[in-house]
Swiss-Prot record:
Organism placement in taxonomy: Bacteria, Pseudomonadati, Pseudomonadota, Gammaproteobacteria, Chromatiales
Molecular function as annotated in GO: iron ion binding; N(6)-L-threonylcarbamoyladenine synthase activity
Family per record: Belongs to the KAE1 / TsaD family.
Binding site for Fe cation: 111, 115, 300
Cofactor: Fe(2+)
Any Gene Ontology CC annotation: cytoplasm
Name the UniProt record assigns to this protein: tRNA N6-adenosine threonylcarbamoyltransferase
Superkingdom, taxonomy of origin: Bacteria
Enzyme class, broadest EC rank: transferase
A Gene Ontology BP annotation from the UniProt entry: tRNA threonylcarbamoyladenosine modification
NCBIfam families in UniProt: gcp_kae1, T6A_TsaD_YgjD
C-alpha cells in the first residue's frame, strides 16, 4: 500500500509518500519559521495562507521524487488535529478533495500519534510495548504504548509545554524564534552550575509536568542579569538543564512504573542534543533503551502522517467525505 501524507497543523507545510513494502519513498517540508520570526511566534492567518500556496507544489514534488503518479496511490492521510483550526482546514480540504477526485480511501490522523510513531520509520525500530515521551511546542506528555492504537496517557503538562517554555524563555533572553535551537546554542557558552533553576513537579509523585513556574524563575534571573551577556548564557544553560532534568526524571519514573524496557522520544524538543545525551546516560544506568527519529523527523513532517495513516488504513479505518478537523483532540480519545 502506498499512502500520500499531508501535514499542515501549524507552521510547516509537508507532504510525503510511504509504502508498506519499501518504506519512505519521498518527503518534503516547507518551514514558515522565517515568515513568523519577526512576530516572535506563529501568526495563524499567515500560516494558513502559506499552506494554500505551498501544498499543491509539495504534493506534486514528492510524487515526482517517488517516481509515482496519483494513480499509483492507494490512500491519503492528513492531519485532522490537534493544531491551528485554519491551518488544519487547508490540509484537510486538499487531502479530502484529492482523495475524492481519485476514488481513494482517506483517513484523518492524530498529529501526536504521528509523532509517537515517527521513531518506527527508522531502520531498526523499537518493538512495542514501550513508553513514549512526546515533547514539542504544543504538547508535553508521557504515553504508555501497549500496541498500535492502544495508548494510555501517563502524564502531561498542566500548563506550558516544554517547547513553549523554550520559546518564551528565548524571548526573555532576546533570542530569535524558534527558541529551542537558539537556547541550545547559547547554553554552550554558559557556566555549569552558575544558575540553578527549579525542576517543577519532580519532588512529588506522578508524571505530570509544569513549566510555567520555571518561566517565572527565568524572568527574575533575566531581570537580575541586566545586560551582562555571560549571565544570559548562564541562564540559558541553567534553563536547558532544568527542562532536561525534569523530562529525564519523569521518563525514568514512567519506565519504572510500567516496566517497559524501551522509550521513544519525539517532537521538536526531542531533537535537543542535551536531552538525548542525558536520556542515553540514564537509560544505560537504569536498563532501558531510548529511541529517536532522525532529526528531520522530530519536527512536524508528513512522513509520520503517511506512516500512521497507512497503519490505520490497513486496520480498516476510513473517513467519509466530511473533512471536519479537531483543533483540540486529546490523545486519550484515540482508539
Amino acid at each position: 500500500m502506498r499512502v500520500l501524507g499531508i501535514e499542515s497543523s501549524c507552521d510547516e507545510t509537508a507532504a510525503a509518500v510511504y509504502c508498506g513494502r519499501d518504506g519512505l519513498l519521498a518527503h518534503a517540508v516547507h518551514s514558515q519559521v522565517a515568515d513568523h520570526a519577526a512576530y516572535g511566534g506563529v501568526v495563524p492567518e499567515l500560516a494558513s495562507r502559506d499552506h494554500v500556496r505551498k501544498l499543491p507544489g509539495l504534493v506534486g514534488g514528492v510524487l515526482r521524487d517517488a517516481g509515482l503518479t496519483p494513480a499509483d496511490l492507494d490512500g491519503v492521510a492528513w492531519t485532522r488535529g490537534p493544531g491551528l483550526p485554519g491551518a488544519l482546514m487547508v490540509g484537510a480540504g486538499f487531502a479530502r478533495t484529492f482523495a475524492w477526485a481519485r476514488g481513494l480511501p482517506a483517513v484523518g490522523v492524530h498529529h501526536m500519534e504521528g509523532h509517537l510513531l515517527a521513531p518506527l520509520l527508522e531502520p531498526d525500530p523499537p518493538a512495542m510495548p514501550l513508553v513514549a515521551l512526546l515533547v514539542s511546542g504544543g504538547h508535553t506528555m508521557l504515553v504508555q504504548v501497549a500496541d498500535f492504537g492502544r495508548y494510555r496517557v501517563l502524564g502531561e503538562s498542566v500548563d506550558d509545554a516544554a517547547g513553549e517554555a523554550f520559546d518564551k524563555t528565548a524571548r526573555l533572553l532576546g533570542l530569535p524564534y524558534p527558541g529551542g535551537p537558539a537556547i541550545a546554542r547559547l547554553a554552550v557558552e554558559g557556566t555549569p552550575g552558575a544558575v540553578r533553576l527549579p525542576r517543577p513537579m519532580t519532588d512529588r509523585p506522578g508524571l505530570d509536568f509544569s513549566f510555567s513556574g520555571l518561566k517565572t524563575a527565568v524572568l527574575h534571573a533575566v531581570e537580575a542579569a541586566g545586560n551582562d551577556q555571560q549571565a544570559r548564557a548562564d541562564i540559558a544553560h541553567g534553563f536547558q538543564e532544568a527542562v532536561v532534568d525534569t523530562l529525564v526524571i519523569k521518563c525514568r519514573r514512567a519506565i519504572e512504573q510500567t516496566g517497559a524496557g524501551r522509550l521513544v522520544v519525539s517532537g521538536g524538543v526531542g531533537a535537543n542534543a542535551r536531552l538525548r545525551e542525558r536520556l542515553d546516560e540514564v537509560g544505560r544506568a537504569s536498563g532501558f533503551t531510548a529511541h529517536y527519529p532522525r532529526l528531520e523527523l522530530c519536527t512536524d513532517n508528513a512522513a509520520m502522517i503517511a506512516y500512521a495513516g497507512l497503519r490505520r488504513l490497513e486496520a480498516g479505518y476510513r473517513d467519509d467525505l466530511d473533512f471536519s478537523v479537531r483543533p483540540r483532540w486529546p490523545l486519550a480519545e484515540l482508539s
